[in-house]
């Protein structure tokens, strides 16, 4: 009995099916975007920022005080999260407020157990 995993009688056709499957399920461009997203979460401070922003939008100074970060450090982390589309900013006069872009991001992180 032959395995259906690697049917050798038509290797060329099977190889093409595998490439199509990879294009559909493991698209390189999408994987690159997803890896950048996860890289943006690969820092304890950025995860803590997200946990704060789950509660409400906050200005940089609130995040600095809450997490005991300097202004340059807080801005650095916020910039990375904003660049990857995880958070957005809104300027009101002299104040810049940050909020999570999409609640689906939080739902996905919660399903992965990243927000417990």
Briefly describe each language-model feature range.
Residues 44, 56-59:
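Short capping segments at the starts of secondary-structure elements
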Residues 47-49:
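Pre-recognition alpha-helix immediately N-terminal to the DNA-recognition helix
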Residues 82-92:
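Beta-hairpin "wing" of winged helix-turn-helix
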């Amino acid at each position: 009995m032959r395995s259906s995993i690697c049917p050798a009688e038509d290797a060329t056709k099977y190889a093409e099916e595998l490439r199509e499957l990879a294009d559909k399920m493991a698209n390189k461009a999408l994987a690159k975007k997803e890896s950048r997203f996860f890289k943006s979460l690969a820092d304890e401070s950025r995860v803590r920022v997200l946990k704060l922003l789950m509660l409400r939008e906050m200005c940089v100074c609130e995040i600095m005080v809450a997490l005991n970060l300097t202004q340059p450090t807080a801005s650095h982390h916020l910039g990375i999260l904003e660049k990857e589309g995880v958070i957005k900013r809104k300027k009101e006069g002299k104040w810049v407020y940050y909020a999570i872009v999409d609640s689906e991001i939080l739902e996905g992180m919660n399903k992965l157990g990243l927000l417990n």
